Design a protein with these regions (language model features):
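Conserved ABC ATPase "signature" C-loop
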Residues: 97-98, 382-383
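The feature captures the beta-strand-to-loop junction immediately N-terminal to the Walker
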Residues: 208-210
């Protein structure tokens, strides 16, 4: 789509011809960005512009903003996530409690570890690696992208032969089974094409794919919001197709991508107990106080939920399912709008839910977040399932990531390229392996 002279936004033909209401969240965000760029402004201000975009969409925005900078235009990005913009940002202004606490270059900011912690910004995983490594290896040079990380780390590690692990045919009890699932919408668009998948009980399962691949359509069948054109969805061996959403939600509950769709009450405290009250689940004042305190919402308990920040609203909708009876929790883009502090709280919560025997199914474009937490992955592409298995199996399938145009997390990519004897999925494990070798 040529939106102005020299500026092109790649939007698929089906997106250009569709009604905005029929697009996925990321596709709608792409269209909004394209419409603003069509005005060709001298100064462009963008507030969390890529929060709903897949890696392809983020790369598109990166490229366009790079072209704008090269042509002398100014862009101001308001965001707590520097992962996508690290390569194009020149200057950083840090604001804490309404005051400017930093005003300087990107490289200065990336060296200021204490300030990064205070602001709770989300950093590129390469910067996290540099920060952790510099504490143990004082002479390491700063890096913030993959090329720099490769160059700096290549001479510091000794490649080892990584033992090829046979894919263990781990048996599991599927809590949800999907059989030959087809979804055709009223306009003829086929959102899901003969999808077969199983969800292992008590695991963290990630649903991956580009915007428009069918991820949200898929999970909306799991809690009955969508009825399939054909196919079957079973919960513990029993079909859910004849049941209402209210009946299904006692066992399988969905937290929407956009929290405004789930906020109904006048206060944060009432919102927290909404699901439990609707399901007739008992709870105590101690339960409420403990959750609000642990997740830093105790000062907000009498406030109107819609007045919270985006990240707090999203966290509140997730917290509201903690008191429900559901043992399968579906999270659609759970990190949307969250800063580093909230994401840290979310990770702990998800791991605690798993420890309690719950099954968590997550849709997310935040690939490092997914690889830190997920045990099992299902990948969709244009409505078809192209992979199902553990993340250990997935990292051996580069062809799958090439097909869906998603990059491996930096720690996984570097584990492979540096010849570590084991592929690791988080920064702490990576640093341990690098310093060991």
């Amino acid at each position: 789509l040529q939106i102005a002279e020299g500026w092109t936004v790649e939007l698929p033909e089906e997106v250009l011809r569709a009604k905005p209401s029929e697009l996925s969240g990321g596709q709608r965000q792409s269209v909004c960005i394209a419409s603003v760029l069509a005005m060709k402004p001298d100064i462009l201000i963008m507030d969390e512009p890529v929060s709903s975009l897949d890696p392809n969409g983020k790369k598109m925005v990166q490229d366009i903003l790079g072209e704008l900078r090269d042509s002398g235009n100014t862009t101001v990005i308001v965001d707590n996530n520097l992962v996508w913009s690290a390569g194009i940002v020149d200057h950083v202004v840090g604001i804490l409690d309404g005051e400017v606490v930093f005003d300087g270059s990107r490289d200065e900011f990336f060296r200021n570890f204490e300030l990064q912690e205070k602001l709770g910004v989300i950093l590129p995983q390469e910067v996290e690696i540099y920060r952790a490594l510099s504490a143990k290896v004082p002479d390491v040079k700063m890096f913030y992208n993959m090329d720099q990380a490769r160059a700096e780390l290549a001479g510091r590690t000794t490649a080892k032969t990584r033992a090829e692990k046979e894919a263990a045919a781990e048996s599991f009890n599927p809590v949800i089974s999907v059989k030959d699932l087809v979804k055709q919408f009223s306009d003829g668009f086929i959102g899901l094409k003969q999808v077969n998948a199983q969800v292992p009980e008590g695991k963290i399962v990630a649903i991956l794919g580009q915007n428009g691949s069918g991820k949200t359509t898929f999970v909306k069948h799991l809690n009955g919001l969508y009825k399939p054109t054909s196919g079957e969805v079973d919960y513990r061996g029993e079909s859910i197709l004849g049941k209402s959403v209210a009946q299904i939600s006692k066992n399988i509950i969905l937290v929407f991508q956009h929290p405004e769709h789930m906020l109904f009450e006048e206060t944060v405290e009432k919102e927290l107990t909404f699901c439990a009250r609707m399901q007739g689940v008992d709870f105590t004042e101690e339960n409420i106080t403990e959750i609000l305190t642990r997740y830093h919402l105790e000062k907000e308990k009498e406030n109107f939920p819609l007045n919270l920040s985006m990240g707090q609203k999203h966290m509140l909708t997730i917290l509201s399912v903690l008191l429900s009876s559901a043992d399968v929790i579906l999270l659609d883009e759970p990190t949307l709008g969250m800063d580093g502090f909230l994401i840290g709280d979310l990770e702990k919560m998800v791991l605690e839910l798993k420890k309690a025997g719950k099954t968590i199914i997550m849709i997310s474009h935040e690939i490092p977040f997914v690889f830190r937490l997920a045990d099992y992955t299902v990948i969709l592409n244009h409505g078809e399932k192209v992979f199902e298995g553990t993340k250990e199996e997935l990292v051996e399938r580069e062809d799958i990531f090439d097909k869906i145009n998603i990059e491996f997390p930096p720690v996984v990519r570097l584990s492979k390229e540096l010849g570590l004897d084991e592929i690791v999925f988080d920064v702490d494990d990576f640093i341990a392996k690098v310093t060991e070798s």
